[in-house]
Amino acid sequence: MAFVEDKGTVYFARFPVGVAAPSSAVVKLLQGLFDRFVDHSFFILRQRIYTTAGLTEMCRGMVKVVAKRITENIRPRDHGELAGLQFVEIGDASQILLPVAYLSQENQKSIQEVAGWLGSHAAVIPARQLELASGLARWVPRGSVLHDYDRDIAAFLLNDQGQLLSYGVNSNSKNKTLHAEVNLVQRLHRETGRPIPAGAVLYSTHKPCKMCAGMIYHWCEDPSQLKVYYSVEEKGGLSRQTVLDQHGLNHHISK
C-alpha cells in the first residue's frame, strides 16, 4: 500500500503482493492522482508519501520527478478510530496497471502500423534510428501555449532481431507521469505481460529522466544486456545520474 494525506483526506493505492510489473502501489497512487486531479495533484503531493513496501528504482524515480518525499517500509498498526479523516482509494487492489484517461491518441496506434512506418524507412545505425524517433515525435500536436500541449518526445523499443516491441510518445500535459518511455514500457506489459528482453535496444529522442530510467531498468529481463540511445541531452537535475547512467546503459548521439 501507498498513501498520502492532504487536508484531512487520505489518498491510497494497493498493489497485489508478489506481482512483477512496471507498476506498484506508489506508481498507481501517483498516476491515479494526476489522472483524477491533474494540476491540483502538485498540491497534494507536497505532502510526504508513505508505503509499506521497499522502494524500487522505478518508485524512487517517479517520486523524484512528480512528487517530493516518501518513506518506505512502514509497518501498519491499529490507531483506533481516526475521526475527521476521509479515505479515497485510487483504483482497486486487483489492478496491476491503472487505466489512465489522458493517454493520447498518438499512443494508441497498433504496433503493426508503427512497425510498418519504421520499416518503410531503412535504418540500421543508431543515428538513423534516432531520426526515426524524431519522426514519431512529430506526431505529437503542438501549439503556441506549450504548457497546454504534450512535449514532442518519442521512443521505440526493438528486440535483438530489430523487430518493434513497443513505442510511446509523450502525453504528459495533464498527467505528468505519462512520459514517452513510461508509455512504452507500460504498453509492453499490457500487450505482452513480459519485461524488456535481453539484447533489446531503446531509442528515444530525449535522455530518459529519473522516472523513465527507473521504470526501464525495473522492467528489464537483464539490464546489463540493454542499450539506450538518445539524441537530446536534457538539462536539469531530473535527468542527471539516472540509474541508466550509473550502469553505463545510456548512449548519447548528438544530431
Predicted regions and their residues:
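Zinc-dependent deaminase catalytic domain
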Residues: 1-255
